[in-house]
């Protein structure tokens, strides 16, 4: 029997901490090396978009998304667990490396802190997850223009908190995420 090495599937997520929008996970198996891969947060939007297309053309991949309602109903950890399982099912027979320090109870997954900046497959997954999520938030900004999603992508910026105070939550806000001043009673 030949000693075949399993391909590496890099896995990362985007949207673990925002107040609005989906949690998006991606798994990527590169067919060939791609120059310029690194943690998506260190790339410009233009460079991320260019690399997104290159990754799609040169990799096997699976992207899974959990809506704000699913995040509220299941919790972040359960969504991450289900996402890892979905990626394993879609990209079978790989070694799986997830950025971070927890496998969320999923077998046959290794973890590495900052893998999105160290391992090309995880960098590619980081790019697919972030671009997918950012594009969705830009679409949501057209439906809910008062929140400015196209700018902050649902993260808890000052402008986003101010919009929440003025307009309250919309359909894509995570109700399980508490916002100071919105969810706590005030004295006045």
Curated annotation (Swiss-Prot):
List ligand-binding residues for a divalent metal cation. 12-13, 99
Q: Which family does it belong to?
A: Belongs to the RNase HII family.
List where this protein forms a coiled coil. none
Source taxonomy? Bacteria, Pseudomonadati, Campylobacterota, Epsilonproteobacteria, Campylobacterales
Listed cofactors: Mn(2+); Mg(2+)
RNase H type-2 domain location, by residue?
6-188
Q: Where does the protein principally reside?
A: cytoplasm
Localization annotation: Cytoplasm
Report the co-factor binding details: Manganese or magnesium. Binds 1 divalent metal ion per monomer in the absence of substrate. May bind a second metal ion after substrate binding.
What Enzyme Commission number(s) does the record list for this chain? 3.1.26.4
What keywords sit in the KW lines? Cytoplasm, Endonuclease, Hydrolase, Manganese, Metal-binding, Nuclease
Q: Name one GO molecular function term.
A: RNA-DNA hybrid ribonuclease activity
Q: What is this protein called?
A: Ribonuclease HII
GO biological process assignments: DNA replication, removal of RNA primer; mismatch repair
Q: What class of enzyme is it?
A: hydrolase
* Reactions this protein catalyses: Endonucleolytic cleavage to 5'-phosphomonoester
State what this protein does: Endonuclease that specifically degrades the RNA of RNA-DNA hybrids.
GO cellular component terms, A-Z: cytoplasm; ribonuclease H2 complex
Stretch forming the signal peptide = none
The record's listing under SUPFAM superfamilies reads: Ribonuclease H-like
Q: Which PROSITE patterns match?
A: RNASE_H_2
